[in-house]
Every structure is written in C-alpha cells, then in structure tokens.
Amino acid sequence: MSERYSGPLVVEGKLADAERMKQESNYLRGTITDDLNDGLTGGFNGDNFLLIRFHGMYQQDDRDIRAERAEQKLEPRHAMMLRCRLPGGVMTPQQWLAIDKFAGEKTLYGSIRITNRQTFQFHGILKGDLKSAHQLLHEVGLDALATANDVNRNVLCTSNPVESELHQQAYEWAKKISEHLLPRTRAYAEVWLDKEKVATTDEEPILGPTYLPRKFKTTVVIPPQNDVDLHANDLNFVAISDNGQLVGFNVLVGGGLSIAHGDKTTYPRTASELGYIPLAQTLAVAEAVVTTQRDWGNRTNRKNAKTKYTLERVGVDTFKQEVERRAGMTFETVRPYAFTGRGDRIGWVKGIDNKWHLTLFIENGRLLDYPGRPLKTGMAEIAKIHKGDFRLTANQNLIVAGVATRDKAKIEALARQYGLIDDSVTEQRQNSMACVSLPTCPLAMAEAERFLPEFVTQVEGIMHKHGVGDDHIVLRVTGCPNGCGRAMLAEIGLVGKAIGRYNLHIGGNREGTRIPRMYRENITEKEILTEIDQLVARWAGERHSGEGFGDFAIRVGIVKPVLDPAIDFYD
C-alpha cells in the first residue's frame, strides 16, 4: 500500500450526531407521526427534521419572507419539498396528470420541478397535505422512499430514445438496482400510507441499522452520451453493448462534486474504473460496493463521509479487492467506451423502432403557467392524448417518447400552442443549467435558478458579439458548494458564495470528464461577465477547429487542468 493510501479501513472516533439520530430512529420512524399531529407548528422538530429526508422530503421555508415573518413574531413559513423516486426518469401520462393536479391544488408554488437527477419535485407542501401527497404517489405506482439522506438515491439512466431496445434493457437494470438497494424498513408505509404495524423485527441486510455514512448516488450510462454526468456519482454502470444488445457494464466508483467553502479537506472527484462485469453480476457488485462504503465510510465527519473520500483513504485497489471478495467475483479489464457529449437532442428524433421522440427544452426544469406561456397546462394537455411514456432527463428536460407517426403533428401543435417549443432557444441556453437555490433551499448562499435565464441572455450577447453565437459553452450555476447544479463538471461553473457573489470555475470539458479549476473567487455578476467577455474573445479568435471552450482554456494555459483533485484542486 502506498504512503498516500495508508489510512485505516474504518475511521475510529466520536460518531457524528447523525449516527445517533439514525440509531435511535427505530428504522426511520422517529416521532414523525407525532409531529404530523402537532398543529402548533408547520414544521418538524428535533431529529424528525432530518429523518423526513429518508422519506423523500426536506423541510424548507420561503426565505424571501423570512425576515418579514420574524418581525411579525411568526415562525418561518414552513413547507416541504417532496422528491419522487423515479429510476431512469420514466413515467406514464396518467402518472403525470395525477402529479399535475396535486401540484396545482396542494402546493404553494403550483409548479412541477424536473431535477437533474431525473425526477420531479413538489415545492411548498404544507404539513397537513403531506400524507395525501405520499398517498397520491402510491395510488399511481410511485413513491418518495430513499430520495434523500444516507441511502442510495434515485438511480439515473441515460435518456436514449433512439436505441430503443438498448435503452429498455439499461432502464430495466436501473429499476432493478434501485429496488435492490432500497431500505427494507416498513416505516414509510406505516407513516404515510397508514399501513398497519407488523409484529416483526425490521432488518436492513444491505444498508444496515444506521444506513449509509452519507448520501449515495448511482447511474446507468449508455455511451456515447454522458447526460447523467457519471463523474458526479458514487457508483456507475457504463453500458457495453454488442449488436444493439446489452452484454455487461464497466463499473466506476467514487465520483462526487460537493465541497465546503474554506475547507481544503473537501474536493470534487471524478469516478475511478474498477473493471468490466457481465450482466449477471450487476446486483451483487452494486450490493458489494454499497456495503463496503457502509462499513468503511467515515461516520465521524460527514464532510469526509462520501465514497470519494473512502477511496482516497484506502486506495482504489484495496476498495476493488474488497468488492470482489464480497461479490464473489473478479473484475475483467475495462471494455472500450467513449463519451462525445452530455446535452439532450432537442426536438424530434426517430428511434430504430420507428417511433418518434420529442425532447422539450424546459428551462431550469420548472413547469409552471407563466404569462403567455402556460407550460404546465401544456404538458397536461399532451398527457391527455399521448399513448407512449414521458422521460425526465438529467438535463432537466422532458421527452415525449414513443409517438406514432400519425400522432406527431397533434403533439407538436399542442407543444407549440403552449410555448413548450420555442425555435429561438439557442444552443447556449440548452446547455446551461442551475439548481433550485433561493427562495426555497435552506442551504443556498446565492441565486441560481432565478439568476440563470437573464444571465444566459447576457452570455448569449457576448457569444454573438464574438461570432460564436451558434456554438455553446457548458454553463452551470449552483447556489452553494454542495453542488446540486453540477457546476464542478462544467466548462464554466459558478458556485454561490454570498448573495450576488460567486466563485468562477473554468476548464471542464463538454464530455463531463474533467473538473474545472477556480479562476476567480467571490466576484459579482458584472465582474463575471467581464471575465467571460475576455475569455470568449480569446476562444473565438484562437481556438482550433471544433475546440470546446474548456479544452481551449486548458490548452493555452488560462488555467492548469485538475488532474488529481485530492492533490491539486486548490493549487
């Protein structure tokens, strides 16, 4: 074992308080039911504030009115964000109509938010409506179990509408992996679905009684598209096909983007290759990776608890050998694969099954009825007549999938009528993304979703001025260093530092395989735009044919590439 990877397999010391909370929760039940019946507050108290995350919810409040309510001696306007479990992002039009109705009638904001983890969120559910939200999901075959906190979260799958058979096979594995790694506790059914308590002892054979040390994210990726951003995830299965049929996976572990401002023991990390496996070993390997991280992950310091830090402590080879031992297999040599991009193909594409698929660009993933653009109503109208399925993408867009040729014109007419198709949207806007951030996210340090549209307009102006208006730069904005906007895999990434201020990172690539380096710290929007103007001017004038902005920034030495982030991210 090298000096670098000489850390202990298990970190000893005083456990983080979250470990106590999980241990005492009675398999995630806590006293959530008591809090649901407490009409004196709109929120959850004590441990329950964190426990509800295992049930797919975050307690939030409207930060725009927090100070005003404090002046009035009122508690914050508590409301919950609820995130659905939707492996691969696939859902039926009937499910869509059910969530559309709930969002319109029972949430403070009246919107459906598609996320870059290929699912949807309701924002602004009052405590008294939470049970009906979970019961509605259950009635249409969905749930919110394990979409947050220290479990395997929603499993992503490349939204590949063209290779229909390969996508179906990969999607089936995403569902199987999700189901296999789910918590076994009956707490969710008892609390939200009013299922009777069964006189049996709960067991968690995979996750264990205190679940995982930290959140855990999994993807199934179909090259050459890296739309799911595999390097942001703990466990990745890269699909290897032969004659259009899925035959196995390359397995990569230990990606992750979240950092903490000012804490140089935290850093983003791209995932490491373990090797190739045939399909039959998929669930055993998934389980072995999860249980190894369960047992070896750092439970004393949550900022150092993710799989990426476990790998840096013990070394990839040691981790790999343990996975092989637990799964009773040996990894084969990685099969060749390559990525060419991450963006969605907006508009119509035809699959090899002769069905048509319409990818709709949904800015920020926010479906709401805007003045003159009733997007949410438009999607409901499409759902009423669509005979295929809907696929939410990891770029926060929506695919109307499986459209027969005879139905194409009708679907497109509805999409245009309601503003869901806008031919003036640029490539730049299509390749820009932000997390939710203010006003609902309690962790937000700066604006992101509300900031992005006008900021992109400014960037479009710069691109046009320098003659590259038809090209794009992968642009991401995240409201805090937890990194939900995946700015740490962008060509230009903004990371919120304070209201109106961001760290500017540049030098990622279009394929999403390189982490960008911080170029300027704690600067304003005006300063950011000045920097981008100067950088785009150089890119436009000096780039090689077809050279992306991030690759250019590295080649000409504007920033040094991040090669080994545990060592050189802060250089």
Curated annotation (Swiss-Prot):
What sort of enzyme, by top EC class, is this?
Answer: oxidoreductase
Q: Which InterPro entries match?
A: CysI, NiRdtase/SiRdtase_haem-b_fer, Nit/Sulf_reduc_fer-like_dom_sf, NO2/SO3_Rdtase_4Fe4S_dom, NO2/SO3_Rdtase_4Fe4S_prot, NO2/SO3_Rdtase_4Fe4S_sf, NO2/SO3_Rdtase_FeS/sirohaem_BS
Residue positions binding siroheme: C484
- Cofactor annotation: siroheme; [4Fe-4S] cluster
Q: Which SUPFAM superfamilies match?
A: Nitrite and sulphite reductase 4Fe-4S domain-like, Nitrite/Sulfite reductase N-terminal domain-like
E.C. number(s) listed in UniProt: 1.8.1.2
Q: Name one GO molecular function term.
A: sulfite reductase (NADPH) activity
Q: Which domain of life is it from?
A: Bacteria
| Biological process, per Gene Ontology | cysteine biosynthetic process; hydrogen sulfide biosynthetic process; sulfate assimilation
GO cellular component terms, semicolon-separated? sulfite reductase complex (NADPH)
Which reaction does this enzyme catalyse, per its entry? hydrogen sulfide + 3 NADP(+) + 3 H2O = sulfite + 3 NADPH + 4 H(+)
Q: What are the alphabetically sorted keywords of the record? A: 4Fe-4S, Amino-acid biosynthesis, Cysteine biosynthesis, Heme, Iron, Iron-sulfur, Metal-binding, NADP, Oxidoreductase
Q: In which pathway does it act?
A: Sulfur metabolism; hydrogen sulfide biosynthesis; hydrogen sulfide from sulfite (NADPH route): step 1/1
Sites binding [4Fe-4S] cluster sit at: C435, C441, C480, C484
- Cofactor mode of binding and number, as noted: Binds 1 siroheme per subunit. Binds 1 [4Fe-4S] cluster per subunit.
Q: Whom does it interact with, and what assembly results?
A: Alpha(8)-beta(8). The alpha component is a flavoprotein, the beta component is a hemoprotein.
* Described purpose of this protein according to its UniProt entry: Component of the sulfite reductase complex that catalyzes the 6-electron reduction of sulfite to sulfide. This is one of several activities required for the biosynthesis of L-cysteine from sulfate.
Entry's family note? Belongs to the nitrite and sulfite reductase 4Fe-4S domain family.
The name this protein carries in UniProt is Sulfite reductase [NADPH] hemoprotein beta-component
The organism of origin for this protein: Dickeya chrysanthemi (strain Ech1591) (Dickeya zeae (strain Ech1591))
What lineage does the source organism belong to? Bacteria, Pseudomonadati, Pseudomonadota, Gammaproteobacteria, Enterobacterales
Identify the gene encoding this protein.
cysI
